[in-house]
Amino acid sequence: MCGVARKPLTVSGNRVLAGGSAASFSGNSLFWSNNGCGGDKFYNANTIGWLKADWKSDLVRAAMGVKERGGYLEDPVGNKAKVKAVVDAAIANDMYVIIDWHTHNAEDYRSEAIAFFREMARMYGKYPHIIYEIYNEPLRISWSGVIKPYAEAVIGAIRAIDPDNLIIVGTPYWSQNVDEASRDPITAYKNIAYTLHFYAGTHKQSLRDKAQTALDNNVALFVTEWGSVDCSGDGAVNAAETWAWVNLMKTNGISNANWALNDKREGASALSFGASGNGGWGSEQLTVSGALAREIVRSWGGDTPPPPPPCSAVSFPGVVEVEAYSQMPKVQLRVETAAIGETGEPPIQCHSKQSPPSVGRGQ
């Protein structure tokens, strides 16, 4: 594998820093690794290399399914091999990589999680590229009574081998109730962040308010999944809410991974059905959500810039030639009090998840 270039990630207050400096990163989450679910064809070096070169992705998430059909409990050797292929490729391409214990019931498989993460820590703990995500999405269970004790046990096992790399912990209610976790954070170990998931078609200002509460309580957040559609993993893209979330993440230095690099016939899939499992996708092979995700990931950068400015009005006489570059969902030009396009043309537009079968995406 290539030499180390990525800076180590550390937590300071409510920020995840890279090499001690403010930073945030954007990239892709793969679909469930489970045998036969379809998304596992993307668990290879060609896909990871393409994401780095074409999407400019700084991170990738290997979502290793645990209990569902074809997952780790049924085939540990096969699923670990897929994860290792992604991790090796990410390190070779100098990307951060999230090793995700992808289940809604991790507390039922504590010993298995400990054994798995011990193996990953022994194998990869020396690389600063590594991020451990020890619980994907807890359901309607207690943070203090269930999730936190599980997390502390798994974190302890990892820290005995890898004392430094970032560990991300899932939060109650499909990793939405970050405010609950922030009121009783894990204090026995350093470099801990908390999982926040959002799907812009469903999750709007009320969830952003929970995120702000957690930040105000001085815990660091990491969005290991986000989608521009609704929480089922399907539905239409909500561009306006997606950009509102981008603004929150950039303003607060929150790194993120888009769900999902897959070609399943659903709104959250970045690729059209039948796309190659080895990269090389043209624009015609991107879905609407995939094109938006690629735009966001490519324009992210490795630092934390100021948020984009709000809409503003400028008025002056004369002829104007305009080019618009914006992270806002819409730009509108007006003549006097009328918007150009109100008589027939639309206003100028700057911008144009689902689990294996039988498993719901969540709330």
Where are these regions (language model features)?
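Aromatic-lined substrate-binding rim segments of carbohydrate-active enzymes
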Residues: 41-105, 109-119, 156-162, 238-253
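Extracellular glycoside hydrolase catalytic/binding regions
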Residues: 7-13, 32, 40-41, 96, ...
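N-terminal carbohydrate-binding accessory modules
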Residues: 1-59, 295, 299, 304-313
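A mature extracytoplasmic/lumenal domain signature
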Residues: 29, 64-66, 103, 136, ...
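Extracytoplasmic
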Residues: 309-363
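Acidic/histidine-rich helix-loop elements
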Residues: 23-47, 66-77, 231-234, 278-281
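Short, solvent-exposed loop/turn elements at domain surfaces
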Residues: 17-18, 24-26, 33-39, 69, ...
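A residue-level signal for beta-strand positions that form part of recognition/binding surfaces
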Residues: 8, 22-25, 191-193, 318-324
